[in-house]
Every structure is written in C-alpha cells, then in structure tokens.
C-alpha cells in the first residue's frame, strides 16, 4: 500500500491555488501497483491494473480522471474474398473538459478492463473489451469486429462500435457506440471489397471500399499524467484480396494483406485489427484489443 499526504498552502509553483481546491490534511492511499505522478500543482496515479484508491482525513476536491475501457477484438476470415473487421476502441470517460468531482472519505475500487480476444474462427465475432471503472464511473469496453460468416458479420456495439466484416458480395454493418457517447460507430464493410474499421474516441471507423480496407477511427493524445499517451483508436479493417490496407492510430491494431490482424496496444483501449483474406481456406485471425487505463489526479 502506498501513502501520499496532501498538505499544501495557497500557492504552488507560482500559481495561486483557489481555497476550494486546497486538500489540506487529506490522505490518499492505494493498493495494487499504480504509478504515481506529479504535474504542475497536481498529483495522482495511473492504474494499468486493478487496485483501490483510498481517501481519508477529509473530502478530496478538484478530482479529474480519464478512464478507458478495453478495446474490442478484431474479426476473422478464411478465404481470399473475405475479410474480418477492426475492433472498436474502448469507451473513454473524462472530466478534464468539464467540472471536477469530489471523493468522500472511503475506498474506491479501480478496475482496468482487459482487451477483447480477436476471433480465431469465421463463425464468431471478435470479443468485446471489458469495462474499466473508478467506483461507479464506467468506461464501456469496445465492440468486437465482425467476421465473414453471415450470422456474425455485423460489428458489435460497445464503447466504440466494431467494424463490419465481408464475405464476397455480402458485407456487414458497423457496430453502434454506447449512449451517452464514449466513442464512435464502426465502419461498414464493402460488398466485393474490404472490411470496416473499428470506431475510435474522436472519429468513426472508416467504411471499407472496393480498393481499400477501412481505417480505424482516431483516438486522442494526452499528457494527463506527464507521459504522452495516444489512446482510444479503433482497429483497421481486414483486406479483401488485392485491396490496399487501412491504417490504425492511437493504439489500434493495423492490418497486412493475407495475415492475422495486429493487436491493439496495451493500456490504450485500442481495437484489434481484422484478419485479411487468403486463398486455400486458411483462417486469418483478428488481433486482440488493447487493455484499458485509469488515470486520476487532484490539486495539492
């Protein structure tokens, strides 16, 4: 267990600190193995695994957070005219653009959602990512990407939706992002074309086309905990034979012709890339989604 006692006056690093944000005498302890950080007049923790945040000695004021769910797994395929879709990014909830919150003295559970497994068969979609949460504040896991089989071709709904898969002249639709919005919809697959990209926090997954697979939706970059992190990107859609590859950013998994999709990056909530078609009946798997993240900070 780690302890941090907050005990400051009204001025930190030359910046005047409003009295309502002074956390004098409040003690914060943690379990698990979060990484502590300090930035400006803020301190906090980055959780890449489960733990607890324990507040004692008074109300912790001015709390900000970014919570990212696990990314969805990519879809699979097993033919040269088929393509699995990209997984959707894990949902993102944050209050850095809005009002801060207060945490009363008690123990707050922190759970970091696992990324969803990429599909290893054309009869199953990629799995949805798991939810991340700080107490009752929940970021929904990303939707799995659709695979080639007709029953599982549509992308799954989630924090951001998974993309739609393709089987020859039949294509699936993109999954829908959760409401209230924590991300964007997945892109649709293209008939006689490539699969759709998974949705990202900032933009929707791109639809596949007859020349190119769908790009994963964009996430965003933040230095909330002093480390520059690119998070919340959707996975790229798998490639129909002869098409060019879509791209993925911000932790989403990419794709390569006639190959398994790439995994989303750990602790970004990135969606997994879709499997790309190959002749001979060989299955090309979807990439796994990236695990989520919980970051929390407060003024001294």
Describe each model-derived feature in a short phrase.
Residues 2-300:
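Low-complexity, glycine/proline-biased repetitive segments and flexible coils/loops
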């Amino acid at each position: 267990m780690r302890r941090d006692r907050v005990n400051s006056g009204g001025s930190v690093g030359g910046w005047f600190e409003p009295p309502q944000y002074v956390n004098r005498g409040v003690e914060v302890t943690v379990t698990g193995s979060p990484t502590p950080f300090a930035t400006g007049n803020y301190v906090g923790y980055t959780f890449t695994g489960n733990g607890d945040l324990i507040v004692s000695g008074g109300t912790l004021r001015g709390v900000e957070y970014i919570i990212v769910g696990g990314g969805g797994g990519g879809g699979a395929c097993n033919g040269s005219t088929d393509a699995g879709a990209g997984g959707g990014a894990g949902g993102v909830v944050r209050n850095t653009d809005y009002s801060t919150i207060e945490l009363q003295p008690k123990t707050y559970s922190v759970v970091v959602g696992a990324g969803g497994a990429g599909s290893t068969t054309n009869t199953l979609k990629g799995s949805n990512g798991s939810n991340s949460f700080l107490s009752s504040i929940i970021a929904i896991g990303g939707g799995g990407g659709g695979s080639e089989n007709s029953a599982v071709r549509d992308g799954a709904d989630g924090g951001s939706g998974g993309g739609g898969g393709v089987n020859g002249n039949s294509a699936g639709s993109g999954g829908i992002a959760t409401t209230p919005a924590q991300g964007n919809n997945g892109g649709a697959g293209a008939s006689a074309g490539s699969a759709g990209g998974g949705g990202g926090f900032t933009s929707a997954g791109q639809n596949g086309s007859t020349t190119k697979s769908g790009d994963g939706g964009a996430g965003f970059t933040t230095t909330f905990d002093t480390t520059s992190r690119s998070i919340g990107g959707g996975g790229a859609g798998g490639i129909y034979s002869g098409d060019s590859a879509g791209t993925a950013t911000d932790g989403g998994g990419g794709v390569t012709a006639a190959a398994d999709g790439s995994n989303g990056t750990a602790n970004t909530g990135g969606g997994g890339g879709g499997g790309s078609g190959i002749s001979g009946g060989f299955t090309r798997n979807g990439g796994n989604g990236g695990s989520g993240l919980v970051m929390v900070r407060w003024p001294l």
